[in-house]
């Protein structure tokens, strides 16, 4: 039975690591070769779902369902004078041509820990990368469907900033054509990462006006600037959307390479995911929209939607809107914004364990104020919950140590006759009331918790650049000096010394190698995860030592 226990432990070690790598295959999107794409000073492109009979100015502007003509390739120079909008949490730049969000940074999230003055950049359409949020009006009279080029909006100022004591900032961009006045309004609020984009159409012409709003995210195939590079820590880079049948449907770049997706949904959202951050367009509730993914001629990947047709009689007004979110993957915020959007915080197949773990971590952190100490207290809580199971396991192992001399005698008695040896061992275990697999139960229980915590530390933006103490300045990445993994290996070795030695020499050698194997695996794991395992091992050693000594004392007393 000892060989079964050894095989089980080795298998669990291998399976845990393979599961991590397999998760990366499913959820991690390898960066594709960077395409040569147009910058914000050259061509600004849009989706492929427009409405109306006008050809689009670029192959990535949408066409309406009634439009059967192919979009025209008409490059139009975008304005170099971007409109700057700043709040306490967002810093974005609007391109007057089309009113797209061409640049966006997050002041509260430094790009690197050693450069707190350089904010992390989400949207970037400056030449080296293409990643922006686009919206417009298409269809029969939509100005963004004009083959001569997208509309050039004007604004009262070139810079807008949320002032102290001000909770809301409204920025209006204006454009007029053929007797129709358009206002593209951006509404931002203090402390929020969502921006409401509203179109107000005032038809002062003698003809009826009709059109549809589209909203989309366009990105090239460049690598995720927020991802880590350690072994086994790649995360999903790609698109996702909401449908009535699937509240969270991923569409990778490879999927877009193979085929276009086109679905009709009510409400919902479309998003682009990367490590720790997400951008999304959220459609109005109850509105029937056409969601589409595609790849344009420049190699950019697009996900977006086109809303229902709008009409305005002569002298009438009409408006429509959508919400753009660009910020961290905060589950509470995303859930409130739109159903299913919180699922972009992807904890993998063990999400049902990971979510309660994160909930506990959050509540502990609200008390102690440090994520490292939160992990330590969480570990203590988990060990307390599983103490009865652990106690039973340690009692079983203590009994195994007690019968070790008898097992050695059986081995000497039966020699190389494995069948008789196994039968004799089973009889001895039965007589002594020992469960030979009892020591494996804590490992079986802890593995799902271990893997779930791994994904919590990997996916939760709260862990990004979260310091602990001393040399651990970021719990979400590997220990820079590999001190914690070495300590973890040492605790495994000590814990192993407390366990009964397998009677078979080969098994004993395999067991001695386990701390080395685990230490190697843990070298590249997030420091927060290794911290959990170190504390877990230390508590296990204390529990096992206490229970073993208690049983030995009781045995000596009974024999006396």
UniProtKB/Swiss-Prot annotation:
Gene Ontology terms describing biological process: protein insertion into membrane; protein transport
Region (Disordered): 38-76
Top-level taxon in the UniProt lineage: Bacteria
Self-association and partners: Interacts with the Sec translocase complex via SecD. Specifically interacts with transmembrane segments of nascent integral membrane proteins during membrane integration.
Family per record: Belongs to the OXA1/ALB3/YidC family. Type 1 subfamily.
Biological role stated in the UniProt entry: Required for the insertion and/or proper folding and/or complex formation of integral membrane proteins into the membrane. Involved in integration of membrane proteins that insert both dependently and independently of the Sec translocase complex, as well as at least some lipoproteins. Aids folding of multispanning membrane proteins.
Protein name: Membrane protein insertase YidC
């Amino acid at each position: 039975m000892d060989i079964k226990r050894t095989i089980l432990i080795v298998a669990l070690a291998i399976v845990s690591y393979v599961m991590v790598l397999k998760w990366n295959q499913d959820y991690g999107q390898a960066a594709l070769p960077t395409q040569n794409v147009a910058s914000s000073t050259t061509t600004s492109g849009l989706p492929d779902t427009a409405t109306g009979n006008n050809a689009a100015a670029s192959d990535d502007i949408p066409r309406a369902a009634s439009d059967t003509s192919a979009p025209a390739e008409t490059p139009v120079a975008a304005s170099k004078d971007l409109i700057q909008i700043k709040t306490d949490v967002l810093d974005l730049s609007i391109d007057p041509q089309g009113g797209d969000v061409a640049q966006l940074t997050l002041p509260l999230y430094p790009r690197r820990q050693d450069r707190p003055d350089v904010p992390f950049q989400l949207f970037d359409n400056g030449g080296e990368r293409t990643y922006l949020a686009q919206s417009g009006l298409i269809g029969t009279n939509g100005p963004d469907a004009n083959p001569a080029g997208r509309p050039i909006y004007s604004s009262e100022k070139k810079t807008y900033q949320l002032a102290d004591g001000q909770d809301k900032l409204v920025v209006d961009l204006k454009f007029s054509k053929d007797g129709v006045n358009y206002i593209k309004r951006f509404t931002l609020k203090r402390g929020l990462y969502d921006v409401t984009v509203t179109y107000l159409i005032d038809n002062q012409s003698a003809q009826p006006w009709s059109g549809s709003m589209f909203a989309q995210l366009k990105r090239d195939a460049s690598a995720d600037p927020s991802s880590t590079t350690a072994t086994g820590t790649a995360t999903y880079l790609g698109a996702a959307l909401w449908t009535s049948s699937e509240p969270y449907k991923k569409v990778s770049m490879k999927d877009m390479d193979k085929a276009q997706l086109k679905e009709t949904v009510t409400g919902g959202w479309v998003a682009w995911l990367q490590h720790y951050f997400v951008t999304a367009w959220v459609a109005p509730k109850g509105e029937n929209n056409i969601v589409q993914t595609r790849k344009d001629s420049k190699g950019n990947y697009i996900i977006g939607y086109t809303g229902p047709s709008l009409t305005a009689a002569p002298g009438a007004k009409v408006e429509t809107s959508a919400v753009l979110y660009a910020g961290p993957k905060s589950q509470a915020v995303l859930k409130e914004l739109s159903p299913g959007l919180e699922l972009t915080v992807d904890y993998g197949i063990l999400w049902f364990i990971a979510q309660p773990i994160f909930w506990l971590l959050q509540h502990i952190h609200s008390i102690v104020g440090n994520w490292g100490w939160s992990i330590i207290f969480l570990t203590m809580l988990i060990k307390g919950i599983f103490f009865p199971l652990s106690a039973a396991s340690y009692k079983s192992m203590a009994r195994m140590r007690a019968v070790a001399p008898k097992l050695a005698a059986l081995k000497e008695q039966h020699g190389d006759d494995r069948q008789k040896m196994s039968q004799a061992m089973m009889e001895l275990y039965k007589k002594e009331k020992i469960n030979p697999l009892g020591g494996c139960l804590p490992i079986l229980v802890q593995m799902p918790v271990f893997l779930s915590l791994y994904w919590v530390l990997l996916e939760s933006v709260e862990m990004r650049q979260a310091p602990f103490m001393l040399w651990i300045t970021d719990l979400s990445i590997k220990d820079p000096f590999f001190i914690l993994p070495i300590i973890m290996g040492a605790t495994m070795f000590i814990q192993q010394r407390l366990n009964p030695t397998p009677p078979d020499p080969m098994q004993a050698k395999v067991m001695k190698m386990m701390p080395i194997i685990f230490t190697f695996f843990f070298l590249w794991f997030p420091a927060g995860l290794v911290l959990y395992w170190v504390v877990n091992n230390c508590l296990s050693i204390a529990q096992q030592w206490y229970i073993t000594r208690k049983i030995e004392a009781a045995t000596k007393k009974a024999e006396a």
